[in-house]
């Protein structure tokens, strides 16, 4: 695909040399526009793949609290109040 693009650009350069100044700008603008569209599509595709991978990895785990267990001992213990000797 890359050699085809290079060949196309070389053909456009020969034609562009024969064109006037405004027409050359239009050709360059079209190339930049297509380049921007391709980059935008690749960026969106990458974002969707990363998001899908994150969702898949989240579904594989049991949840946020994986590995935690309940304690057998109560958190709060009652204090034994003893009267001081008199």
From Swiss-Prot:
InterPro entries per the UniProt record, alphabetical: CD3_zeta/IgE_Fc_rcpt_gamma, FCER1G, Phos_immunorcpt_sig_ITAM
Record-annotated ITAM domain positions: 54-82
Phosphothreonine sites (modified residues): 78
Topology in the lipid bilayer: Single-pass type I membrane protein
Modified residues (Phosphotyrosine): 65, 76
Compartments in which it is found: Cell membrane
Positions in the Cytoplasmic compartment: 45-86
Regions crossing the membrane: 24-44
Main location as per UniProt: membrane
GO-annotated molecular function: IgE binding; IgE receptor activity; IgG binding; protein homodimerization activity
Record-level GO BP terms: antigen processing and presentation of exogenous peptide antigen via MHC class I; antigen processing and presentation of exogenous peptide antigen via MHC class II; cellular response to low-density lipoprotein particle stimulus; defense response to bacterium; Fc receptor mediated stimulatory signaling pathway; Fc-gamma receptor signaling pathway; immunoglobulin mediated immune response; innate immune response
Residue ranges annotated as Extracellular topological domain: 19-23
GO CC entries: external side of plasma membrane; Fc-epsilon receptor I complex; Fc-gamma receptor III complex
Assigned keywords, A-Z: Cell membrane, Disulfide bond, IgE-binding protein, Immunity, Innate immunity, Membrane, Phosphoprotein, Receptor, Signal, Transmembrane, Transmembrane helix
Signal peptide: 1-18
Family: Belongs to the CD3Z/FCER1G family.
Function field: Adapter protein containing an immunoreceptor tyrosine-based activation motif (ITAM) that transduces activation signals from various immunoreceptors. As a component of the high-affinity immunoglobulin E (IgE) receptor, mediates allergic inflammatory signaling in mast cells. As a constitutive component of interleukin-3 receptor complex, selectively mediates interleukin 4/IL4 production b basophils priming T-cells toward effector T-helper 2 subset. Associates with pattern recognition receptors CLEC4D and CLEC4E to form a functional signaling complex in myeloid cells.
Record note on quaternary structure: IgE Fc receptor is a tetramer of an alpha chain, a beta chain, and two disulfide linked gamma chains. Associates with FCGR1A; forms a functional signaling complex. The signaling subunit of immunoglobulin gamma (IgG) Fc receptor complex. As a homodimer or a heterodimer of CD247 and FCER1G, associates with the ligand binding subunit FCGR3A to form a functional receptor complex. Associates with CLEC6A. Interacts with CLEC4E. Interacts (via ITAM domain) with SYK (via SH2 domains); activates SYK, enabling integrin-mediated activation of neutrophils and macrophages.
Name of the protein: High affinity immunoglobulin epsilon receptor subunit gamma
